[in-house]
């Protein structure tokens, strides 16, 4: 656990995040950047493109996110609530 906490302050690699954390990161990044290309560009600093795409597909499939237009993603907040952003992920989203 100590190593995981240290790694958040010293830079992240994709394997350090749980599946749930990856999903939360992607969902909050969508709120910040609705343009899919920009979103992927920003998130590749902390997640692999494969993880980003997989989480976008899962969020769309579970109707937590919807695609509006060819390159725009939007959280479907009328369908589901946004997950709370854990403390350890706030700085990551803030710095995207």
Predicted regions, residues:
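Long, low-complexity, charged/polar intrinsically disordered regions in eukaryotic proteins
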Residues: 1-15, 92-95
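Minor-groove-contacting beta-hairpin "wing" of winged helix-turn-helix DNA-binding domains
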Residues: 71-77
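Short amphipathic alpha-helical interface segments
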Residues: 15-44
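A short, conserved structural fragment
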Residues: 60-71
């Amino acid at each position: 656990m100590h190593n995981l906490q240290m790694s958040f302050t010293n830079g992240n690699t994709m394997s350090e995040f749980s599946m749930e954390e990856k999903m939360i990161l992607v969902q909050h990044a969508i709120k910040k950047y609705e343009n899919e290309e920009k979103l992927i560009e920003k998130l590749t600093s902390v997640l692999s493109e494969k993880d980003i795409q997989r989480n976008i597909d899962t969020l769309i499939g579970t109707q937590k996110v919807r695609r509006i237009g060819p390159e725009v993603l939007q959280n479907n907040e009328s369908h589901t609530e946004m997950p709370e952003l854990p403390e350890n992920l706030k700085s990551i989203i803030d710095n995207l």
